[in-house]
Structure formats: structure tokens, C-alpha cells
Amino acid sequence: MAEAKVLSGAGLRGQVAGQTALSTVGQAGAGLTYRGYDVRDLAADAEFEEVAYLLLYGELPSKAQLADYQRKLGKLRDLPPALKEVLERIPADAHPMDVMRTGCSFLGNIEPEKDFSEQRDKTDRLLAAFPAIMCYWYRYSHDGKRIDCTSDEPTIGGHFLHLLHGKKPSELHVKVMNVSLILYAEHEFNASTFTARVCASTLSDLYSCVTAAIGSLRGPLHGGANEAAMEMIERFSSPEEAVKGTLGMLERKDKIMGFGHAIYKDSDPRNEVIKGWSKKLADEVGDKVLFPVSEAIDKTMWEQKKLFPNADFYHASAYHFMGIPTKLFTPIFVCSRLTGWAAHVFEQRANNRIIRPSAEYVGVEQRKFVPIERR
């Protein structure tokens, strides 16, 4: 038997754990691509549903295919009464990611994936239902309202905003949500995606794979960076105060979320896109504090540590300007990244072998058992 290769590096940094045709991350001259398309081009000119179709079905849709796909998703938005009842029983102080996890798992009980031929239809069902799962629980637990889980909004981003606020969203807000969902849709073998692939490699059902991925994203070292960034940004009332506060945090070696990346070395290509849209939202509402504070923190982190903002940092202010509660930031990530998770599940299933690495043992040497009477 060939000697097993011992992997080095905390968190398996730099190790290749498999093959994918879905995305590239951090390659020179590319930054981030989905099936060969630069994410910046997709964010500029595509609908999120086009990107979802690209990831899940393999190619960008034609105009007719996109219209059919959006109609299909529109018909799948409502929630079963039993799921609404479950969501009503979840308290307002529950972690929203727990709500998403429970909603996904319960839907898998009443609308199961009977075999793998249903994988795309079940993914489309989750893609259509996730905004309603999040908003139905939030509006019921916080406002006491049983909302209509359907809307005439053609896009998932517009539908989410409509359910959350109970009214038709502005064109600018719909555009920004569309861009945000595209930017978060896929990102190679990140922790939650790899979790989904490990689960898929056992030939488990789609709902189990997605539920496992949600559980992984719930951890603060993976999801939640935009929430933590928002909480930090809101502490400061001016750019000057932000600079002083950031320097103090660096001196105390506090963790500052929203900066740096495990793969990108010089910049996160998603950041430049969402920063521009955050600025447009700031101008729309006449903001004179939040965006300048964000820029002050950004500049200080670069000057002091040469750390660049990742996709999460300016997402915080963008979501805030659209009236989205901070606690819902990471569940939005779920609504988007579902497309990447599911595409990886499909890919794993298509050429599967159970993922079962070995561990390097670092414990005590083999020893003789001593009966309890002699210990």
C-alpha cells in the first residue's frame, strides 16, 4: 500500500480536496468565476435567476428559458400550512439560522426527495421557499403577522424584500438584492459547501446536505461576518471616531470581521461591486455617517495591516440601507448560496466516492489494558 500523504497547514489551507467545474476562486486574472463567467460581469448584467440556472443546469438560459424558470419559481413560493405552524412555534429570540435549518429539514419531511432524479426540482422548491421561510417566521415572531408568502415580484430578491417589508420594493433595492445574491451564490470548497459535499458523498438526500451546510454556515468563522461588521460600524458616529476605535481594536488584538480572506491575497473581487452599490444606497437615503465610517475603517485596516475588505464588509451597510434587520443578514446568504451548495451536491453525486480522509494520529503509543481492579 502506498504511504498516505500527510497534509500540513491549519484548516487544510492550500490543499486540493477534489475537482469542480463550478467556480474558480483567487486565480490570477480571474478572481471569481462561475462556470467560466467573471462574477463582476454577471453582477453587472445578469439576473440572479440566470446565475442560479447557470449553476444548477449548466449553461446560461435563453430569454424564454429564463422566463419559464422565473414562472416556475414563482409558483413554488408558498409554504405548506404544516411548515407555517412549525415556524409560528419558533420564538423570536431564536437564531435565524436555526430557523432556516429547521425550515429546510421540516420541508424535507413533507416534500421528500424520493430519488436523485428529483434533485433539481427539489432545489428549485427550496430556492423559491427560503425567502418565505425566513420572512414568515420573522414577521410572525416579531410583528404577530401571518404574511402572504406569495407576491407578484418576478425576482427572488424583490420577492424577499416584498415579504419582509410588506410592500413593493424600489427598483434600486431590487437591483442591489439581485447583485448581492449573485455575489454570494458560489465560492468553491468553502466550509459549508464542503460539508454539503461530504454529506452528499454518503448518498444522503438533498435536504440533509443543505441542512448540514446551513449548520456549517451558522458558525461565526464562516457566516455572520456581515452581521459582526454591522454591529461594529454602528458603534461609531463619525469617521474620526471610527479611526480611533479601529486603532484601539487593533492594539487590543480584537477580531475585526469583514477583512482579509483565506484564498484571496490582494483583494476580493466581490467587494468592489457591493461597495459601489452601498454608496448608491447611501446617497439615496442621504447618509452622512454609516458609509463614511465604513470607508474610514476600510482605510485604517489597509494602512495598519494591509488587510482588504471582503464581500461581507460593505454588504453590511448595503443591507442596512435597505431596512434589513441585522439578524437576517446571514439567512440571506443561505438564500443565495443554496445554488452553489446544490450544484456541488449534483456534481458529487455524478462522480461519487464517499469522502473519507485519514487522520495523522498524535496520541499516546499503544499500551496494555489494565483491569479496573488494578487501577
What are these regions (language model features)?
Residues 1-375:
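Non-transmembrane, aqueous-exposed alpha-helical and coiled segments at domain scale
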